[in-house]
């Protein structure tokens, strides 16, 4: 069974093995604090919830790929390069999920339901730039009552 924990472990493994990514975290978007991380680019995963459709569970995630420009960097040049690099990392994640399973390999079948990339540009309130990969991952879900940890309940 593929769980939220399994998915986070795979994203962390991807971040550790990727030559571009320097840090990994997960949690809410507000957890991305400039003072919290020393190394950038950062891959930050936000679990936005799941839905159940027939025999499937759909995990919805936001994957932030962010860099911190040097203070003297030319804003436009930096953002162009960083958005390009971050988008390539997002495409590497998708390619591994859809084609290879080098990192995102599980004993169970899954598929990418939808994916989109949004560029994130530096503003006055946020000096980070990169992209947001909005991702849904579809896994089989059987609504199996046999696995419920209920005292006194016998599986049928």
Where in the sequence are the language-model features?
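Charged, amphipathic alpha-helical segments and their flanking helix caps
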Residues: 1-27, 46-156
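A short, hydrophobic beta-strand-centered structural micro-motif
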Residues: 37-48
């Amino acid at each position: 069974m593929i769980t939220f924990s399994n998915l986070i472990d795979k994203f962390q493994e991807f971040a550790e093995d990727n030559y571009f990514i320097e840090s990994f975290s997960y949690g809410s978007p507000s957890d991305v604090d400039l003072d919290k991380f020393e190394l950038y680019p950062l891959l930050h995963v936000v679990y936005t919830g799941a839905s159940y459709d027939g025999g499937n569970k759909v995990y919805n995630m936001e994957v932030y790929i962010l860099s911190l420009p040097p203070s003297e960097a030319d804003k436009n040049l930096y953002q162009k390069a960083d958005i390009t690099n971050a988008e390539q990392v997002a495409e590497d994640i998708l390619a591994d999920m859809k084609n290879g399973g080098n990192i995102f390999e599980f004993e169970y079948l899954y598929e990418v339901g939808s994916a989109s990339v949004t560029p994130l540009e530096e503003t006055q309130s946020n000096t980070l730039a990169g992209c947001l990969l909005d991702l849904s991952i579809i896994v089989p879900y059987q609504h199996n009552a046999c696995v419920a940890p209920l005292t006194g309940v016998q599986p049928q």
